[in-house]
Amino acid sequence: MKIARIAVNQFRLPGVEVVAQLVRHYPQGAHFAHSIGYVGRINEKESKALDSVEYRGTQSIGKTGIERFYESELHGHVGYEEVETNAQGRVLRVLKHTDPIPGKNIVLSLDIHLQEAAEEALGDRRGSVVALDPQTGEVLAMVSKPSFDPNMFVTGISFKEYAALHDSIDRPLFNRVLRGLYAPGSTIKPEVAIAGLDSGVVTAQTRVFDPGYYQLPDFDHKYRNWNHSGDGWVDMDAAIMRSNDTYFYDLAHKLGIDRLHDYLAEFGLGQKVSLDMFEESAGLMPSQAWKRATRRQPWFPGETVILGIGQGYMQVTPLQLAQATALIANKGVWNRPHLAKTINGVAPVDENPMPNVVLKDPRDWEQVNHGMQLVMHDPRGIARAAAQGAQYRIAGKSGTAQVVAIKQGERYNRNKTLERHRDNALFVGFAPAEHPKIVISVMIENGEAGGRVAGPVVRQIMDACAPARIWPLR
């Protein structure tokens, strides 16, 4: 109506004209803000870097997410004509004509039903969820909370609105899936177990006695098991099922930092793993060389011990944890996580594929898978409550990672710990365990208990998508 009034009264408004303009709109709003990203007005720095011909008349450009990564594919190419004119500017003939090429159509792998289920399961807590298809690497869901409405950025956001987002202590603009760096805690114990088996340091039957702590030879310091009373004699099945720290302290020490680093790096930890995700962090997989270069200090045996339970210098993203777990599910076959399902009808190609994780004895994959199933389905499994009543087999691993250090001899006391200093809760899992079709990684900041808090989130998401993915009832 307002446009019509201006058009009718345009003779009274010299210098005013109505110009139609296409503007990007995100109908799902905050639901896909961290995966799709958003476009925004081209700033001065971007204007200098862009092709002035290709972007003539263009006012917006991809700023984050898929919008940023696939900017050139989505933008297309401008058309133009070269003409001959007379002195008055009248066109005499067309010398050359080039048709414009529209941007490519990109179909994403995200499942809106699964995305909604993941958001509902996570609730209002700060954290992230990422779900992958281990057979293809397709990202089925990506949630980072809190989120924001990307439509705010399309035509320009006010300073006040941007400051409210940027300065928020909850960091809604921060993509926790790709950029959040966290200690993985016990979620990496399956990968450490693979390292122990493949290197020959242990067998599935090797037993370690757990009195509730571990001590390095000739050292007094006690590295505590989460179960302070101890689990007694434990083999690999029991160690994974009970998330026994003492077993993995011992295993990490036997492996040594060099072998432990090299094996974990094969699973993508400490490096970028995605095919098409903007701003992904590499994380940190520490080594002796890294510490010498950055800290100018030698590597100490105790640092290897705590690395065996995902503590210390190590930092990973939730996406890396999902990918490492996908490799367990997929028996070492690498498929880089990606958001684009097709580009103009063609699936994206990984031009720099990662080498598969090849074990000396492929049966070791089944051994670790079995231990992860015990986590969920054995009466003593650490996350058995999360799998109660499930009509399919789940393989999972919980993780509870310290945010601040606790002194020797002290115990974690949530009532004396600031909310944002409380432990992070993590969980990774896949289902159905025998023929995995989905891998899920959940991280809840300051959630405290991986099995008790993050585990039910994974279960709720799996239940929501089970019928659609036709899982066998077991």
What does each model-identified segment do?
Residues 85-97, 134-187, 191-442, 471:
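Beta-lactam-recognizing serine transpeptidase/beta-lactamase-like catalytic domain environment
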Residues 1-159, 181, 199-204, 209, ...:
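Periplasmic/cell-envelope proteins involved in peptidoglycan metabolism and beta-lactam response
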